[in-house]
């Protein structure tokens, strides 16, 4: 009778044993880790100033994920380096899994396919493989990210790195400080102009739009920027119980229009911008149920930081008109007229 070949390929068997051990170790790091919780779901890089120094002192901070605080003003470069490290680790894991599959399937050209894996780069990974890489969130104020770190931010938005930038906007608008061409005043539009990143402009006054924007930014496979209006009563000059009201008013007054831009959406650039969430989006200004019209001036008037830009309407003021009517006039119609904001006594 014929007898089957009982020869054992010891080198092949050793490769399988080694690969099995490496896969088990990788799974242990990913699923369990040192503390039984597995790998962190995301990381945070904070672009801070002296007021954020406390957050760098582990464990005396509220974060339950790896956090690094940059005090040098180079948070964009730091975030890029960190996420590239994440991507390298993910690529190494994918390389290991692909190699294990090759050794099991043993296709034609196994040797050169094995060698080709050594040059695998993260940009060659499949979308489902890239999902293994935890996102990195770059968090900072508009002053740190859009003013001092503007060049780094623009570079990030034009890279393919999966860095998610969360900009806490004060909506300073270049009015508090005598600045020229302040990038903070239009950081959302500036990011939009790059066309390559997911961009959202939102407010804590609209929790649904805010939450959806963050979720979509995290799901996007490239860079993303979410600008969120994060008011501060002590900084901006109003009572703390008006915080949410001010956030809602910023949207209603068109000071901060809500929008989202997804480069993956169908159509051309303009058709990929969604204005969903804005009240009365077909109208220039919002009119509430009490027939009160909101304007950016009404939003600014409610904040002490803009007080120097207002003064009582004098009797000698020429042709005074309510500010919402002034907005509806063309350039010729506005000539010689004084816009005013009406307030109730007391």
What are these regions (language model features)?
Residues 1-164, 173, 177-194:
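Cofactor-binding active-site loop characterized by glycine-rich and histidine/acidic residues
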Residues 115-137, 143-289:
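Glycine-rich ThDP/TPP pyrophosphate-binding loop and its adjacent helix/strand module
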């Amino acid at each position: 009778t014929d007898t089957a070949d009982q020869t054992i390929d010891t080198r092949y068997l050793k490769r399988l044993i080694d690969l099995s051990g490496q896969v088990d170790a990788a799974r242990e790091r990913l699923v369990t880790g040192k503390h039984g919780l597995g790998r962190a779901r995301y990381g945070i890089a904070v672009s801070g100033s002296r007021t954020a120094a406390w957050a760098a002192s582990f464990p005396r901070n509220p974060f339950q994920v790896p956090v690094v605080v940059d005090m040098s003003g180079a948070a964009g470069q730091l975030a890029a380096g960190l996420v590239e490290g994440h991507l390298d680790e993910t690529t190494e894991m994918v390389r290991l899994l692909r190699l294990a599959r090759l050794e099991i399937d043993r296709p034609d050209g196994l040797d050169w396919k094995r060698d080709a894996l050594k040059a695998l780069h993260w940009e060659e990974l499949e979308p489902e493989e890239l999902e293994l890489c935890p996102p990195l969130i770059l968090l900072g104020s508009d002053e740190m990210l859009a003013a001092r770190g503007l060049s780094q931010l623009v570079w990030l938005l034009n890279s393919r790195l999966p860095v998610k930038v969360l900009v806490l906007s004060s909506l300073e608008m270049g009015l508090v400080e005598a600045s020229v061409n302040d990038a903070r005043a239009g950081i959302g539009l500036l990011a939009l102009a790059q066309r390559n990143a997911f961009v959202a402009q939102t407010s804590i006054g609209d929790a649904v739009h805010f939450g959806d924007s963050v979720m979509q930014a995290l799901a996007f496979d490239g860079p993303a920027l979410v600008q969120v209006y994060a008011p501060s009563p002590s900084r901006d000059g109003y009572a703390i119980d008006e915080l949410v009201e001010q956030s809602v008013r910023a949207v209603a007054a068109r000071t901060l229009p809500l929008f989202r831009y997804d480069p993956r959406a169908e159509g051309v650039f303009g058709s990929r911008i969604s204005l969903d969430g804005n009240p009365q989006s077909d109208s220039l200004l919002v009119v509430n149920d009490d027939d009160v019209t909101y304007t950016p001036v009404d939003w600014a008037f409610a904040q002490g930081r803009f007080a120097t830009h207002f003064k009582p309407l004098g009797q000698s003021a020429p042709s005074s008109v309510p500010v919402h009517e002034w907005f509806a006039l063309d350039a010729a119609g506005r000539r010689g007229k004084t816009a005013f904001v009406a307030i109730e006594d007391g």
